[in-house]
Amino acid sequence: MYLPKEKEIIQIKSYKHNGKLHRTWKKTVVLKSTENIIIGGNDHTLVVEADGRKWVTREPSICYFHSDYWFNVISMIREDGIYHYCNLGTPFAVDEQALKYIDYDLDIKVFPDGRFHLLDEGEYEQHRRQMKYPDSIDRILKTNVDVLSHWILDKKGPFSPDYIDIWYEKYKEYR
């Protein structure tokens, strides 16, 4: 498997279950790259939606991807604290073009005070019917919602107190 090197700039591409491109983040700096974990950082990066719409992120973010879990975490560094946006999706795959994953609609938003909410359940159910997600995928996603909830409550991985300090400092050094 191809692995990007630290300091390398990569794209992140999310797809839907039907194979269609969903969204592309144009520039993310690789901060850590192993077979199991890729951590990246970006700030004011161009994002292109599948329909061609474009927008630019507003704040620095640290992105966490794992090869064993069906979620990734985008930690947004804002003036009033750290917000985590967690996408339920496949473990990452990476090649010379981009880091890639399939987005399965469900998201968890974590607020600076630790509160969190599961989002987009209606969109998930609609796409589950339209794209015929297998029951096995549904079970995996529900299990990973539970795993992610425990990580948030236990302040594990990207939710640990030192995580942002360490990786944001490295991002500022690399960019």
UniProtKB/Swiss-Prot annotation:
**Required co-factor?**
Mg(2+)
Q: Which HAMAP family match?
A: Ntdp (MF_01568)
PANTHER family (UniProt xref): PTHR39159, UPF0374 PROTEIN YGAC
| Alphabetical UniProt keywords | Hydrolase, Magnesium, Metal-binding
Q: Which InterPro entries match?
A: DUF402 (IPR007295), FomD-like_sf (IPR035930), Ntdp-like (IPR050212), SA1684 (IPR016882)
Originating species = Listeria welshimeri serovar 6b (strain ATCC 35897 / DSM 20650 / CCUG 15529 / CIP 8149 / NCTC 11857 / SLCC 5334 / V8)
Provide the protein name.
Nucleoside triphosphate/diphosphate phosphatase
Where Mg(2+) 2 binds, per the record, is at: 105, 107, 120, 123
Q: Membrane-crossing residues?
A: none
Q: SUPFAM superfamilies attached here?
A: FomD-like (SSF159234)
Q: Which residues form the active site?
A: 23 (proton donor)
Enumerate the residues binding Mg(2+) 1: 87, 103, 107
Q: Which reaction does it catalyse?
A: a ribonucleoside 5'-triphosphate + H2O = a ribonucleoside 5'-diphosphate + phosphate + H(+); a ribonucleoside 5'-diphosphate + H2O = a ribonucleoside 5'-phosphate + phosphate + H(+)
